[in-house]
Amino acid sequence: MKIEYQETTNDLLARIDIHKKYGSRDIDQWILHLLDPQKGSAVLDVGCGSGKQCFLFYKVLEGDADITGGDVNRELLEKARQENAKIGNRIKLIDLNFNQRFPLNDDQYDLLTSCFAIYYSEDIPFTISEMHRVIKPGGRLFTTGPMPENKRLFYDIIYEATQLPIPPMPGSSRYSSQIFKAIQEQFLKVEVHIFENPLVFENVEPFLAYTRASLSEDRRLWKTLFEDTGGFEHVMQQINNVATQRIAQKGKLVMTKVVGGFIATK
């Protein structure tokens, strides 16, 4: 199934920044606690984007690891390459489309991560099989993605504002079902871990910034709500009205990110 999706650097980084400023928990520390990555490991991050996970592993392992990041988005990869240059290009960055055979050898990595990316695959079983192929026997796959109850407030406000059905999201609509099943079928065992991070907005501006970045980043997914810039701005004004009313009534907006972390062993 082809996913209509377009990711941009500015929108992605805006959401990451808002998570940091308004969330009460650090997902990076949660990931490190779960995985306990070891020095000397070979690590691959699939769908690495601007390199966030690669640089996290590089820092915590003090550079003592063979780290590779791959992505199909050239804009985000260029951002990663700019950051990589600052550390002497210690991370290998490659063009990698997870809808195609990975340009990598079998049994190569101790740890393969794919954070908030795998659900954009057009053929989930194929992508999982490629991940399985390049992981060493006994190695691990770690994926993250939104669970069905993720940021319920966000969708409730959009529905109240537009009175239009929320389109199915590639993540929350199939991460805990189709993707989890595909991983179970190909790996020896799978652990499920849940991360919850309440984002608290005491005024409407950061919530609107998050919403604007989300709708803009995923604009191909939201095409049933607006067709052009004028339609987008009209929807944003409707959302502004509803969000402002809710803050006036309750004093704040609390939007909880609910993320599933799957750890699979080959």
Regions found by a protein language model. Give the residues of each.
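Class I SAM-dependent methyltransferase SAM/SAH-binding core
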Residues: 42-46, 50-100
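A short acidic, Gly/Pro-enriched loop at the edge of an enzyme's catalytic core
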Residues: 102-111
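Conserved class I S-adenosyl-L-methionine
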Residues: 1-38, 52-56
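A short SAM/SAH-binding and catalytic strip from SAM-dependent methyltransferases
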Residues: 111-123
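Conserved catalytic/acceptor-binding region of the Class I
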Residues: 125, 140-203
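Conserved Class I S-adenosyl-L-methionine
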Residues: 4, 50-52, 173-177, 186-266
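A short glycine-rich, Lys/Arg-flanked "PGG" loop and its adjoining helix->strand segment in the class I
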Residues: 125-137
